[in-house]
């Protein structure tokens, strides 16, 4: 399969821009119309799978909640395992935890301590790359577990927030749709 401009346009057409949400001046990129439309969701998953096909990885890690959609699909398509990065207190066994900075405060992600065996190559997958905090935290979880990051894949990148810069420490960063301008459709 080849990722065509037509495929990207099909995906882009299903991402709804919602002005002033969650606060004035913010344009929220709503992917629920894409997920509600079977052919568009299929196109998005196929395109992400194709974009990451050349990467060598053993598992996929994704963060709740929307990241689970694309992480699960990529793990399934590549016949690889899936590691769930959860908010604190959601996993029942021993965990490895990483805290990261948000615009206003901090947050944390956790994985089971045995989810990523040493030497495992892991693909970081999420729906959105914004400031890079969540993605960077997933990379840190992989490395803290003794694994290595094979690459990072996103459906959408908000390029104007420069989250990619937090990930360019040797990681391949792939995004299907990049909004370079906060007001762009």
UniProtKB/Swiss-Prot annotation:
Keywords: Cytoplasm, Glycosyltransferase, Purine salvage, Transferase
Single GO MF annotation: adenine phosphoribosyltransferase activity
Keyword Cytoplasm included in the entry's annotation: yes
Cellular compartments annotated: Cytoplasm
Reactions catalysed: AMP + diphosphate = 5-phospho-alpha-D-ribose 1-diphosphate + adenine
EC number(s) from the headed UniProt entry: 2.4.2.7
Protein's name in the database: Adenine phosphoribosyltransferase
């Amino acid at each position: 399969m080849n990722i065509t401009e037509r495929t990207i346009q099909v995906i882009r057409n299903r991402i709804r821009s919602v002005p002033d949400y969650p606060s004035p001046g913010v344009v929220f990129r709503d992917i629920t119309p894409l997920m509600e439309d079977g052919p568009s969701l299929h196109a998005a998953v196929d395109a992400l799978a194709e974009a990451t096909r050349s990467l060598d990885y053993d598992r996929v890690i994704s963060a709740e909640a929307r990241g689970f959609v694309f992480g699960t699909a990529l793990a399934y398509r590549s016949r690889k395992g899936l590691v769930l990065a959860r908010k604190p207190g959601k996993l029942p066994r021993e965990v490895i935890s990483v805290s990261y900075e948000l615009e206003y405060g901090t947050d944390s992600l956790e994985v089971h301590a045995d989810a990523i065996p040493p030497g495992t190559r892991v693909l970081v997958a999420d729906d959105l790359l914004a400031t890079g905090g969540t993605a960077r935290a997933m990379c840190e979880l992989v490395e803290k577990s003794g694994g290595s990051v094979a690459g990072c894949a996103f459906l959408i990148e908000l390029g104007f927030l420069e989250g990619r810069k937090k990930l360019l420490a040797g990681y391949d960063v792939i995004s299907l749709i990049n909004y370079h301008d906060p007001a762009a459709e």
